[in-house]
């Protein structure tokens, strides 16, 4: 009788082991999926920092067009080209560059006004993912998810400029270059900049990188 009672006991042990193993594998799969999401978020942030730094360098190289046009014809400044209310990233300026409406300053000599438009056009393309395209299809795969870029002046010291005909001196402007994008999961809503507000549904999915840069300009 004892032998009959023990029949099937080993099979039950195997089944229990399989159940435990299945739950363990599911847990590992969940951790791997979460790790991939975290890694993707980190990659997005890294790309956003690079994009903000790129525009900061462009502005410092053409600082006279940072906020206001110098004396002469009307122009598009960096802050006017990428305002908070209509941020860059739609590809409209980059399309102007590709069709020749914006001058290619890498191949031709440009004025400071033309250089500003060239910088704005290229940055618009980078935000829109044109830096890398899939072979054969042309699909944009180089950007971050629904990226938008904004440039705003946060402060300046122009009030310290001496009245003419005092000797020429410099004043400082602080510009904030912001890059926003759409995150995977809900987090607390960002407060560093309003760039991209309302573009991603709930603001808890909006991610933001804000980069402040100081530019010096001659007093008017």
Name the predicted role of every residue range.
Residues 15-16, 43, 49-220:
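Flexible, low-complexity segments enriched in proline/glycine/serine and punctuated by aromatic residues
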Residues 2-53, 62-63:
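Aliphatic-rich helix starts adjacent to a transmembrane/signal segment
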